[in-house]
Amino acid sequence: MKKSLIALTLAALPVAAMADVTLYGTIKAGVETSRSVAHNGAQAASVETGTGIVDLGSKIGFKGQEDLGNGLKAIWQVEQKASIAGTDSGWGNRQSFIGLKGGFGKLRVGRLNSVLKDTGDINPWDSKSDYLGVNKIAEPEARLISVRYDSPEFAGLSGSVQYALNDNAGRHNSESYHAGFNYKNGGFFVQYGGAYKRHHRVQEDINIEKYQIHRLVSGYDNDALHASVAVQQQDAKLVEENYSHNSQTEVAATLAYRFGNVTPRVSYAHGFRGLVDSADYTNDYDQVVVGAEYDFSKRTSALVSAGWLQEGKGKNKFVSTAGGVGLRHKF
């Protein structure tokens, strides 16, 4: 009897040790096709087409926490890409961190979503192609090796600050400062995310002395309806004298409504003509994405979408169309 009790206790130890560890992830893949036409004058200068089986952002992760007493908890997460095409390698290449959580809020260090990225509900699409998601306005979003503090919520309001060091910025070699806030009241919400960078290297021959970005998102979200509008403004002062100023303002909107198991969705984005080298330049764009999800269950959904993007206007423009179908499973 005593031996049986000892054996049962020993067998339970690994289970107890892993009780606070959660395995989670998403597998999503599909087929996408696209066609892009570059115009030069009245004629098409080049046409590119493509169709392929693609991974739509699959991931796998482990997370957990430990109660340290007095309301303080240690929290951790290790998350990585898990492409069905087998093209991803390495651990912790998505959001991965260790930190502390308590009544003071949450303090983490690791590879973390930027504050700007956490306002990214304006782009809810699962896609590989840039033409099947509002990816141009989402381009500045990133995960940074950084330290981040998130405050607790007070009357629906919470805030975040984040700092990324020079030596962790990789090829960009730029320290950056980030801040934002969230406000919720019933289904209504307002989000702000901003960043400021110094000595940012874009390419080998393009260096930015100062860069800042601001995004404001507002909308309504409940179990059936999601509606959101975003405005984003970027401004960069380049080091080279002949490229002294570069700025652009962008807007986007997304609307979705759930009918039973089906959720149709539409997004629109527009980039206003920006300033490059102190002169107007045709970097404006318009983009539309439409699609729907069908839920077979709480975990498995079918995806379908179509997109259109036009960059520039007049005789010199770039027009792309795309379509895709896919399947997503969460665990």
UniProtKB/Swiss-Prot annotation:
Q: What is its main location?
A: membrane
Lipid bilayer topology? Multi-pass membrane protein
Matching InterPro entries, A to Z?
Answer: Gram-neg_bact_OMP (IPR050298), Gram_neg_porin_domain (IPR033900), Porin_dom_sf (IPR023614), Porin_Gram-ve (IPR001702), Porin_Gram-ve_CS (IPR013793), Porin_Neis (IPR002299)
According to its UniProt entry, the protein's GO biological process terms are: monoatomic ion transmembrane transport
Q: Where in the cell is it found?
A: Cell outer membrane
Know the name of this protein? Major outer membrane protein P.IB
Q: Where is the signal peptide?
A: 1-19
Organism name? Neisseria meningitidis serogroup B
What is this protein for, i.e. what is its function? Serves as a slightly cation selective porin.
Name the PANTHER family for this protein. Answer: MAJOR OUTER MEMBRANE PROTEIN P.IA, PROTEIN YDDL-RELATED
Q: Which Gene3D superfamilies match?
A: Porin (2.40.160.10)
Can you tell me which family this protein belongs to?
Belongs to the Gram-negative porin family.
Q: Which UniProt keywords apply?
A: Cell outer membrane, Ion transport, Membrane, Porin, Signal, Transmembrane, Transmembrane beta strand, Transport
Which Gene Ontology CC terms are recorded?
A: cell outer membrane; pore complex
Q: Which Pfam families match?
A: Porin_1 (PF00267)
Q: Which GO terms describe its molecular function?
A: porin activity
In terms of PROSITE patterns, this protein maps to: GRAM_NEG_PORIN
Q: How does it assemble?
A: Homotrimer.
Concerning CDD domains, the annotation shows: gram_neg_porins
